[in-house]
Regions:
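Short catalytic/ligand-binding loop motif for oxyanion handling, primarily in non-cytosolic enzymes
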Residues: 19-23, 28-29, 126, 189-191
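Short beta-strand-to-loop acidic/aromatic patch adjacent to the donor-nucleotide binding site
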Residues: 8-21
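Residue-level recognition of short, structured coil/turn motifs
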Residues: 7, 57, 137-138
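A glycosyltransferase accessory/donor-loop signature
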Residues: 92, 96-211
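Conserved catalytic core of nucleotide-sugar-dependent glycosyltransferases
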Residues: 21-116
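Active-site-proximal specificity loops/subdomain of glycosyltransferases
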Residues: 1-5
């Protein structure tokens, strides 16, 4: 929904457990007018891709085999997001794309007692976004793939897993292609503990301890 409000063509999505590894500016995130997009194996979350393809009434077998985009941190195009909203909008008067998605999760709605509706439940905004871009043939117009020889930067690296053996200095090294890493909230680690480990590598961090 934020795509209806932002003025820039691209916007960055973040979660609270994402850590920025180096100073950033637009030139590191947007290359020749196209935003970085990073692949991951669809096998990590196969239901996302199947459910999203069903919602968009398309085959999930598009693009590089077995690959889809990562989730946060992610760069998204306002134009592509708006086109996704149009694709999701029902033809029925008085309903919009929000209704179309949220109604799938209402157990009291008799329509959801049909197996076909149940099989659409596991969507995410990222799988919908990527598949819609592929359906419309617009992905390459707005995105460049991260982690290639031409564009070595990575939006996300996984050096922080497992946390106990994390080489923090290596993650923050200027030569590391990673722009962000994640210390997942599901680890249940106290934020203060994580902060104490990363603070020495973040300029001015001593003045900004976490709550």
């Amino acid at each position: 929904a934020i795509a209806q409000l932002v003025e820039n063509e691209f916007y960055l999505t973040l979660d609270a457990d994402v850590i920025c590894l180096k100073p950033l500016d637009e030139s590191k995130l947007i290359i020749d007018g196209k935003a970085l997009l990073q692949y991951e194996q669809r096998a990590q979350h196969p239901k996302w891709w199947k459910s999203s393809a069903r919602i968009l009434k398309m085959s999930p077998d598009v693009g590089p085999k077995d690959l889809g985009m990562t989730v946060t941190p992610a760069l998204m195009s306002r134009t592509l997001s708006q086109k996704l909203m149009q694709e999701l909008s029902p033809n029925k008067a008085g309903e919009n794309w929000v209704d179309a998605l949220c109604s799938l999760h209402d157990p009291a709605n008799p329509r959801n007692w049909w197996i076909g509706r149940f099989l659409k439940l596991k969507w995410t905004e990222y799988s919908l976004y990527y598949l819609c871009a592929m359906k419309l043939g617009l992905l390459e117009q707005y995105h460049v793939i991260a982690g290639t020889s031409q564009t070595p930067a990575l939006l996300l690296i996984h050096d922080s897993h497992p946390y106990e053996s994390w080489n923090i200095a290596g993650s923050f090294d200027a030569a590391n292609p990673g722009l962000f890493c994640v210390v997942g909230s599901k680890t249940r680690l106290p934020p203060k503990e994580v902060w104490q480990k990363v603070a020495p590598y973040i300029q001015g961090s001593a003045e900004q301890p976490p709550l």
